[in-house]
Amino acid sequence: SNSPFSENSLNGFSSYRSEVWKDTDPDRTGILTFIFDDGMSYEQYVDYAMKVPMYFIYRNGEYINLTGYTFDDFINGKIEEVKDFYPTIDDWELHLTTIFPEARLKKFIEMRGADAGNINHVCAHYRLFG
């Protein structure tokens, strides 16, 4: 599912998995073109993540819907619904789990295209990059 083949035939895509994700939620999926820029940095990834629309925050056992707002809005106090809450590192870490580019920064770099192959292909991928 992450290759140009489907059911033993060429499917017309370099990566069918990438093609499906491209139409799922373009704000939080796909290939981040800035990662190929000279001088690419973690700061650029943070800037990108700050502008990705949020889903929610979790407070006092409840999810608070923040759809349509960015983490940048939240951290700058621009969201009336949560004006009494201050962003926490837990909020940031939760937000980062809702972003799904092809290569995702976590405590490691998650190569998302490798999550949909058979066991031999998955092992080969990690051998290649490991």
Describe the predicted segments one by one:
Residues 1-130:
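C-terminal accessory/tail domains of diverse enzymes
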